Amino acid sequence: MAKHGKNYREAIKDIDLTAKYEVSEAMALTVQTGKAKFDETVDVALNLGVNPKYSDQMVRGAVSLPHGLGKTIRVAAFCKGDKETEAREAGADFVGGDDLIEKVKNGFLDFDSAVATPDMMASVGKIGKILGPRGLMPNAKTGTVSFDIGKAVSELKAGKVEFKVDKAGVLHVPLGKRSFGPEKLLDNFRAVIDAVMRLKPSAAKGTYLQAMALATTMGPGIKVDTQSVRKLLEG
């Protein structure tokens, strides 16, 4: 078993890692335990009561975080004609049609998110095996396939986050930087949970929000009492 470093041991000194904390306290502890020398990202891991191997229990979507992610998002826009100008004016970092697709085929992946107009999707599909595994494939469900390409680009640049449940029924979603502080991170957290709750599949049975934890990039996982999350949403 790998040994944890001094910073990690120092971070967990006064924390019970087996306990479930009220969400506001959990967020404060998460920020407090971040001891790395860089501005760590705070993530939430959600265990959902779904079985993603069934298509009617897949949870996939996107949410615009009120305070963004605290980092520059590089966006690739697959489009042509006037839409290229629209995408560039909205702030897309890389814009093109077949030329950009060819570039990706040759190994170019220097972007964090991708958008496309519907008329480009047949061509973009040819690089689906490259984009898909990296979470970069444009998708209508997340608003990244649209003729309103300017809006799609603007939302991503402003901190729109895409998410998709994994095979184990777990969602990992970034909430922003530790330097945001507990209050802003809690605002972003609320936006994420709101979006996830709205996407609850009708086929999902039993408890939907089964467990969750917060953590910084290098820090310990702080377990969250899901009942306190429900109260947060109601409040």
UniProtKB/Swiss-Prot annotation:
CDD domains to which the protein is assigned, alphabetical? Ribosomal_L1 (cd00403)
| Xref: PROSITE patterns | RIBOSOMAL_L1
According to its UniProt entry, the protein's GO biological process terms are: regulation of translation; translation
Instruction: Write one Gene Ontology MF term.
Output: structural constituent of ribosome
Which UniProt keywords are given for this protein, alphabetically ordered? Repressor, Ribonucleoprotein, Ribosomal protein, RNA-binding, rRNA-binding, Translation regulation, tRNA-binding
Gene3D superfamilies with a match to the protein in the record: 3.30.190.20, 3.40.50.790
Matching entries from Pfam families are given as: Ribosomal_L1
Coiled-coil intervals, chain numbering: none
Look up the record and report any one GO term of the cellular component aspect.
Answer: large ribosomal subunit
- From which residue to which does the signal peptide run? none
InterPro entries per the UniProt record, alphabetical:
Ribosom_uL1_bac-type (IPR005878), Ribosomal_uL1 (IPR002143), Ribosomal_uL1-like (IPR023674), Ribosomal_uL1/biogenesis (IPR028364), Ribosomal_uL1_3-a/b-sand (IPR016095), Ribosomal_uL1_CS (IPR023673)
- What does the annotation say about its assembly with partners? Part of the 50S ribosomal subunit.
- PANTHER family to which the protein is assigned, alphabetical: 54S RIBOSOMAL PROTEIN L1, MITOCHONDRIAL, LARGE RIBOSOMAL SUBUNIT PROTEIN UL1M
Q: What does this protein do?
A: Binds directly to 23S rRNA. The L1 stalk is quite mobile in the ribosome, and is involved in E site tRNA release.
Q: Which family does it belong to?
A: Belongs to the universal ribosomal protein uL1 family.
Could you tell me which HAMAP family the record lists for this protein? Ribosomal_uL1_B
Query: What is the protein's given name?
Result: Large ribosomal subunit protein uL1
Species of provenance: Solidesulfovibrio magneticus (strain ATCC 700980 / DSM 13731 / RS-1) (Desulfovibrio magneticus)
Q: Which gene encodes it?
A: rplA
